[in-house]
């Protein structure tokens, strides 16, 4: 049975949607025989309330999350999903290709609460796939 992986990240520009699509495709090319990727861009339509409910339902079905953490700070919705998934005991792998630091100090990738919720934060798609493979193998 395939494990469900929730792909979290901002979806407010074509560039963000294209990047999310690229991440999903890369993950599935390497691990598609073992996982199913749930991406809000493909499941969510309607009012803000319907979007919220469908995303929470999808999060509840997934034990693993990939969180896109690029930008001057983490997207608000992504940060909420990270916290929710962490509180439910899920494993979160962040990907941050943005070379700007967005945390409390020079060694922080992002906000301490988001960073502390992730089992790892990686900087490339190859490292993301490798980390997901380790989680699936454990």
Please identify what each model-predicted range represents.
Residues 1-138:
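Conserved catalytic or regulatory cores that recognize and/or transform ribose-phosphate-containing ligands
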């Amino acid at each position: 049975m395939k494990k469900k992986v929730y792909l979290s990240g901002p979806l407010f520009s074509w560039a963000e949607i294209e990047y999310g699509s690229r991440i999903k495709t890369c993950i599935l090319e390497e691990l598609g025989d073992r996982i199913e990727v749930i991406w809000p861009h493909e499941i969510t339509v309607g009012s803000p309330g319907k979007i919220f409910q469908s995303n929470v339902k999808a999060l509840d079905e997934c034990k693993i999350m990939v969180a896109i953490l690029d930008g001057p700070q983490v997207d608000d919705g992504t940060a909420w999903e990270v916290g929710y998934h962490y509180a439910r005991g899920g494993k979160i792998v962040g990907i941050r290709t943005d070379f700007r630091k967005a945390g409390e100090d020079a060694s922080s990738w992002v906000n301490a609460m988001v960073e502390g919720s992730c089992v790892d934060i990686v900087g490339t798609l190859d490292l993301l796939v490798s980390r997901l493979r380790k989680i699936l193998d454990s």
